């Protein structure tokens, strides 16, 4: 085997190496008789839903190659690699008739060495009737749920091979008549070089590092009846005003290491292999791997397309209390298979793109992600 092919083969093995490493970590966790109780202890899980359909189709490994407006979400450092202003809008048909939407815009300046961007994401559903044990047919009242975050990003190229970025964001969680607010930071780096004249990129991302959410509002108000002491006569009185106190909940902080390598890097076509290892506060360590085939200037035109697929693994979260083993092993994966594709057109500084991704959510079924992007 030639030195050239040996290097590329070694890199692909390294990318796929995330697979046994992740499986070993899961087996070690199960062998130590520790169940995965971190899941469900964090608030604002919608922060993990994603941004662009391209990133959703490529799973957790995408931060290594995110260089458009979606980098504001996936890796702030990638925004510094943008060659032109870019805007992106996405909509996600989530489960149980809920919908997640995301939008971002970014502007390079200072000769393209620095980029400033803004993003907003929201998850919610329409008004629903309120049912109680005393009024199972409905109280006549209605409630809604809306979770929103907004962020500002600043990213910069510190050399021709290294960029870094930071995002500050505010998170608002409105659950009917109860609500809470938190603040968080995202940090990201991107190291880009070449191996045997083929691009290679490393990314390190720390996301959702911030304050806890504590809920308050009218939903926590309660009337406390007066209870007489033993031996005392009951004293008629109206319930006294009171309020339940809630525990504060942390955000789903995530640390991610991603690697991407262009196995094929021709003038108008590219095959990229990606791998990722991640650790969330709400779950045990996980990993993902994926690939993307992209072609541009089809037939000498400005049209191009991309095809993507990935698999993201996170330890199952349904633990049998008797055997301490996974109860629904295959169906309880946080993420599974994701596939997608997109069409784009470029002419000079103008670019437009449409992308789609399908992500399997285990027992929750399949979900669809659509994205429209514009560059100028």
Model segments located where?
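Outer-membrane beta-barrel porins/channels
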Residues: 26-55, 99-100, 104-376
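N-terminal periplasmic accessory domains that precede
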Residues: 70-78
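Cleavable N-terminal export/targeting peptides
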Residues: 1-41
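Short strand-turn segments of transmembrane beta-barrel domains in outer membranes
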Residues: 60-63, 85-94, 357-359
